[in-house]
């Protein structure tokens, strides 16, 4: 099995606790509400929402994909960290076994948040991950993040 690791870091004006509540804890409700063309729904197939939980994410009509399944590894509400794996679905190509994601939201000195993400692609055999595959995923995630950030700015009393 081969692999590829991609790290990214960006900032937000939204405080880390508020952003974590929306971006991680309530994403299954918030994203279909603000971006139904991207995510139609999210449902828990196994578990209680904590570590070990398996979720099915059904994409909206504007997506090239039908669904994916996530397995949650950890959620740390105090340290604002979250990790899960994409374990099934048509977003995984024939060459990718799974993708592990780790997200950490760090309070920034200016009152906002530094968002640190790591994506680990586990390939079947020694297949190389195409840069455009990673770039496309990054752009979609960035777009969703900007929608969440915009929603929080437009609704300052939510997720406090």
Curated annotation (Swiss-Prot):
Pfam families: Bet_v_1
KW Metal-binding (keyword) present: no
GO cellular component entries: cytoplasm; nucleus
Biological process terms in GO annotation: abscisic acid-activated signaling pathway; defense response
UniProt keyword annotations, A-Z: Allergen, Pathogenesis-related protein, Plant defense
Domain of life the protein comes from: Eukaryota
GO molecular function terms listed in the Swiss-Prot or TrEMBL record: abscisic acid binding; protein phosphatase inhibitor activity; signaling receptor activity
CDD domains according to UniProt: Bet_v1-like
Record's subunit section: Monomer.
Family: Belongs to the BetVI family.
Protein name: Major strawberry allergen Fra a 1-D
Organism in which the protein naturally occurs: Fragaria ananassa (Strawberry)
Source species taxonomy: Eukaryota, Viridiplantae, Streptophyta, Embryophyta, Tracheophyta
């Amino acid at each position: 099995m081969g692999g590829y690791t991609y790290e990214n870091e960006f900032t937000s004006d939204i405080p880390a606790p508020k952003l974590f509540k929306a971006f991680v804890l309530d994403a299954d409700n918030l994203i279909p509400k603000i971006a139904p063309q991207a995510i139609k729904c999210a449902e828990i197939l196994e578990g209680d929402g904590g570590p070990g939980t398996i979720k099915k994410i059904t994409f909206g009509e504007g997506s090239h994909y039908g669904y994916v399944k996530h397995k949650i590894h950890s959620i740390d509400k105090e340290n604002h960290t979250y990790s899960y794996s994409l374990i099934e679905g048509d977003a995984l190509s024939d060459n990718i076994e799974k993708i592990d994601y780790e997200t950490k939201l760090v309070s920034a000195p200016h009152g906002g948040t530094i968002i640190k993400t790591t994506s680990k692609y586990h390939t079947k055999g020694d297949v190389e991950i195409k840069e455009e595959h990673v770039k496309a995923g990054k752009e979609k995630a960035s777009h969703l993040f900007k929608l969440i950030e915009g929603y929080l700015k437009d609704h300052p009393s939510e997720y406090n």
